[in-house]
A protein has these predicted regions:
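Glycine-rich, small/hydroxylated-residue low-complexity segments
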Residues: 5-7, 15-428
Length: 428
């Protein structure tokens, strides 16, 4: 019996001793797969691994991350290196920029930031950035950035089909010659589950206790209790998708007065998942082609035309499947009362025969829009009056008691605004 236990113990020791090597091998394969998928999924961040030196209990790797600015098309390469520690069930990777976290001679951080990746054999990975307090000054522009320490964390599980993100930054402030801004208690939480293609379901919430804006040419403005909540949910069979975004502010403080709450809601309802996935994918491909180095070549032009055709086909399929989009709720509190409104546009679901006869997406669209503004708001504030004057002059906003109201209906490519019919041009 004693011999059996000795043999079993020896087997466990051999297994435990061999696991770091196996973990290191799996980690290298996972790293190659993740970087390949990241590069294929989008053009904005491209990862290149120049070397991966795998040892028994640890590894070293290095390469270049290339970040693309979508506005200018400029790229910035950032060389990195990392040390990998192999454990029994996973690995721990510690990343560092080769040129440091700040330019030479700059003292941006009180302590060194830490960027780590923890992986597990069963497909779970946790990427975490721990940042100390930051102080960045630009003497030439007179701008400065100050932040407290913060943390950003992303956990990926179920072979990449689920993800959770958390960002916590107690304080951020930016100041310049024209404006200064301070944000307190910034927090983001995001939970996602992959549905199909580029489509994910889940919830996300971002909040800030307060946002304070100051300018030499204007009164201070403070927004308290700012919160954004988004959700995307599929039906039981995963064929239809409902998505929504609400933005709320508890109070807005201006000139020693407080107004609130404020709320705006955006909604996408009853989307066909396959068509929506095809539309988002083809639009992403079109954007990527526009940013590609050979965007002006004949071959690139032909690929762009094909991508545009794919976008049009996906939009047509999405419309034929039926959907609703709009702003179900708008509430803004002002010194003179609330501004309220809503806007919804709907396309009915079409049969196969109706889809074959479908000439334009717009032809079947129906919609409704309502807006109500306190009349005294336009009378007492010249800036508001200037914005509303054209609508009042054309009869789009009409007096109704102590309010200015707009009531619009869309049907058969004609918009009825307070009794005035306006034909729509056939745009798409």
């Amino acid at each position: 019996m004693k011999a059996k236990w000795i043999i079993a113990g020896a087997g466990v020791l051999v297994f435990a001793g061999a696991m770091p090597w196996a973990v290191g091998y799996v980690t290298e394969q996972q790293w190659q797969e993740v970087t390949r998928e990241l590069n294929q999924a989008q053009p904005f961040v491209q990862m290149q691994t120049d070397h991966y030196d795998r040892g028994f209990f640890g590894s070293e790797l290095g390469g270049v991350v290339t970040v693309l600015n979508p506005e200018s098309g400029e790229t910035r390469p950032i060389a990195y290196r990392a040390k990998v520690t192999h454990g029994v069930t996973g690995s721990f990777i510690d990343f560092k920029p080769v040129e440091g976290w700040a330019p030479e001679g700059a003292n941006w951080f009180q302590e060194r930031p830490r960027l780590t990746l923890e992986t597990r054999l069963w497909g779970t990975a946790v990427l975490e950035l721990e940042a100390p307090a930051i102080a960045i000054n630009n003497p030439e522009s007179g701008e400065s950035l100050r932040t407290s320490g913060g943390v950003a964390r992303i956990e990926i599980s179920d072979a990449g089909s689920q993800a959770e993100a958390l960002v916590v930054w107690p304080q951020l402030s930016f100041s310049g010659p024209d404006m200064s801004m301070r944000i307190d208690d910034f927090r983001v939480e995001h939970k996602m589950t992959h549905l199909e293609g580029d489509i994910w379901t889940g919830t996300a919430e971002a909040s800030m206790a307060s946002v304070a804006l100051k300018s030499p040419e204007a009164q201070p403005l403070t927004i308290e209790g700012l919160r954004a909540h988004s959700s995307a949910e599929a039906d039981a069979d995963g064929q239809r998708l409902n998505s929504g975004l609400s933005i709320e502010a508890g109070k807005v403080r201006y000139k020693d007065q407080a107004y609130g709450p404020h709320k705006v809601v955006f909604a996408l309802e009853n989307l066909d998942v396959a068509s929506w996935s095809a539309l988002t994918t083809s639009m992403a491909e079109l954007q990527g082609m526009a940013l590609a180095p050979d965007a002006d070549s004949q071959g690139a032009f032909e690929r762009q035309i094909a991508a545009m055709d794919a976008v049009n086909t996906a939009a047509r399929d999405l419309s034929a499947a039926g959907f609703s989009v709009g702003l179900p709720e708008l509430v803004l509190d002002t010194p003179e009362g609330k501004v309220t409104g809503n806007l919804m546009i709907t396309h009915p679901e079409l049969s196969a025969d109706q889809k074959a006869e479908m000439l334009m997406v717009m032809q079947q669209l129906t919609g409704e829009m309502n807006l109500s503004v306190p009349l005294v708001l336009a009378e007492n504030y010249p800036a508001v009056r200037m914005q509303l004057a054209p609508l009042i002059k054309q009869g789009f906003l009409v007096p109704e008691g102590d309010r200015l109201v707009l009531a619009a209906r869309l049907n058969d490519m004609v918009v009825d605004v307070n009794g005035q019919e306006i034909p729509l041009p056939p745009l798409f």
